[in-house]
Amino acid sequence: MGKKNKSNGGGNTNNTPTKTPSKPPVKFNDKWASIENGEAKSASVSHYKEPSKEPKFVHPAKLAKEKKIFDGLDIPERVLAHGKVVEQNGGKKRRHREISPKMEAKKPKVESKSKDGVAAKKAHKHFTVSSEVVQSTYFFEEPDNGNEVTLVSNGKETTIEKTVILDEEVEDEEIDEEEFEDEEEVEDEEGMDEDETEIDESEMIVDPKDIERCIEFEDVDDEDEMEDEEEFEDEEEVEDEEVDDEEEEEVADEERGEEQEDEQEEEEEVSDEESVVSEMDADSDDEGFIAGKDREAHVISKDKAARTFAAKPVDFDAFPFNDQDSVVTASRAFGFMVSPCDVQTFFDKFYQSNVLVVHRKTPAYYGNLFSTTRFSELLEKHYLEYNMNINIAQYKDGIRTTLNGKGRVYPQIVKQHLHNLCSVQLVNPQTFDDRIWYLCEILQEQFGCFVGANTYLTPAGSSGFAPHWDEIDAFLLQVEGRKYWRVWAPESAEEELPLESSGNFTEDDMKGKEPVFEGWIEQGDMIYIPRGYTHQARTDKKVHSLHVTVSTGRQWSFANLMEKVIPEAVGALTEERHKLRRGLPIGLFDMGGVVDLDYSQEEHFTEKFKIVVDRHMSRLRNLVADHLLDSSVDSMTKEFMKQALPPILTDKEKKRSVIGLSTNLLGDDLIDFCANTKVKFIRKHTQRLLMESEDSCFISHRMNNSRLFEGRPETLVDFPSTGIDTYRVLWNAYPEWRTLDEIFSCRETKSNTRKEKLAAIQILFQMGVLLVKNPK
């Protein structure tokens, strides 16, 4: 509610008509009297340029407020670790709105009464004030005539008749409510476009005591204004006209200062925005989630699939998907696996969201990828152990049983288990079988993470595993026989995309749950089961089943990235920010806890603990977002280099690399690094250049990795900083070859000597990531 005008010519305070004196007495600092004497100043000058000379009344409620330490608006810049200083714009919370010459000053909305007696809206209380005197607009009452008011707008005076209409205090029973509402709508529309509709000054009727002038701020919340008005509602009756906008601005500044302590570098706008974003993100977690049976698996029929398949079976010994670009190779292999669904459609429609089933009319579609015969050969030739390489399982009468022995697994023992209707799982076939190694290794370039495999041999009329979900995305390739599958979608957002596999469910657990897919997967077919989908299968009573599961995405999520980034960020912020190293507040144990107790210092919980923690978290978030996202990508890439399968090389690649092929150790055919020697990386993602500091770097690569998951320590090789430009040229040129002359003479490497460039090339070759082709 606006403040009442207490000027000597402005009427009484109880809003009842009185007789106007012929000439009001002039008091000290009477600004309305100065108009009469010809000494009038604009409203912006008189109310905002000159402070009051009379003592101001301060309400006791204001005196009881805690004093602020600072207002938080003097922050010149924000300093963060691991990056340059970022200058701030000083904030916008109390920025005065300036009116340019091209912008017309806002006209006040006032009460008016038309000739037909219909009242318009109540007077608007907030106006935009220009710093320019010529654009000021104000009203004053004629001292000799209490029934007239003079409007002064840009130096032009207009005398109009006064009709007193009070805010929310007078109801005109003669006014028709429908006409009043219609008039409001019309004036609202007119007020929205001031350029189209001009206010008729002759119809403007207003009482000066109903006018309140205030500065319009861009970012002051309505809630803060309501608090100001409620706080000074009682003050209005005793306060004179000098309680103006300068005092209101001071009160508003104090309220903002209460939410800050001694953090002059903190921007409250940023933290407020982050809170809103966080709440919106939390609210959107469940948005769009489709539970359980409402999801639909997409099934591609045999008739549709038959038109896309080549008649000739694939020979995995011949590296069928190879291209000079390893990323293209990966895309070809993945396209073969999910065909006839194209790669982009799969990632748009199915990846980590829906089941995809592909039925094919070609039983030999997967060629010589894997077979029961090949499994027997691996058992005979390799030392495969229980638990590490082989699991024996049986699911009977709703109970899953593991029947693993100890030591090496022999073919004859496996045969006995199969005869007893047990399922045999080969945990890591890529370690022993080159064909599965080839498929998994090249798919790593597609997914950017470790890709592994399992094989499951299950005799006819049996089942080896109870219903469960896995922590990986699974592509099940049916290479022999057939299997009957049931797949259930997650029933809540909490079950979506788990990072750990589930335990075994019973048949009772699955009762009442409708699967999204239930049916046979035949030889040559494929089914994709997203992470977190519960599944269970059984074989035909007359036919055994052998399928290869290609798995990806294990522990490769945003959560895993955050687990790496946050500790690094906390360490970096702790080094830079001494306030993060301060001790916890005294009496913290008595401020709060999970259990609802009568904590003696609970009133200090927000001020001493919560606000401080929120401030540190805001700085932590800014540090991660502004300076650690790039390094987080490097961290995950380094993790990939440690876990990933090594590349499987063709004979030609072996011959051109440091590995060699049928190398004559006593021969004279040495690899020569001359001007016409051509070089390129073996794969796009076999190596990664990482920065340890501004002038120190190293390379992490997977050339020497074990085919057993993390079977060897990661390989890290120091790399000279003078070779960074050479590395960059090779990276940008991939998959094309570049001669040494092209590398040495290009603009990117001109800052390095020829010796430094050659040294970088030789280091890359010696660590095994470079292919070299000598001129003939």
Curated annotation (Swiss-Prot):
Record has Transcription as a keyword: yes
Residue spans of biased composition, Basic and acidic residues class: 47-57, 98-119, 206-216
- Name the domain of life this protein comes from: Eukaryota
Spans of biased composition, class Acidic residues? 166-204, 217-288
Give Gene Ontology CC terms. Answer: nucleolus; nucleus
What are the BP-aspect GO terms? negative regulation of DNA-templated transcription; response to ethanol; response to heat; response to osmotic stress; response to oxidative stress
Q: Where does the protein principally reside?
A: nucleus
* UniProt cofactor note: Binds 1 Fe(2+) ion per subunit.
Q: Which GO terms describe its molecular function?
A: 2-oxoglutarate-dependent dioxygenase activity; histone H3K36 demethylase activity; histone H3K36me/H3K36me2 demethylase activity; histone H3K4 demethylase activity; histone H3K4me/H3K4me2/H3K4me3 demethylase activity; iron ion binding
Under which name does UniProt file this protein? Answer: Bifunctional lysine-specific demethylase and histidyl-hydroxylase NO66
What is the source species? Caenorhabditis briggsae
The taxonomic lineage of its organism, from the top, reads: Eukaryota, Metazoa, Ecdysozoa, Nematoda, Chromadorea
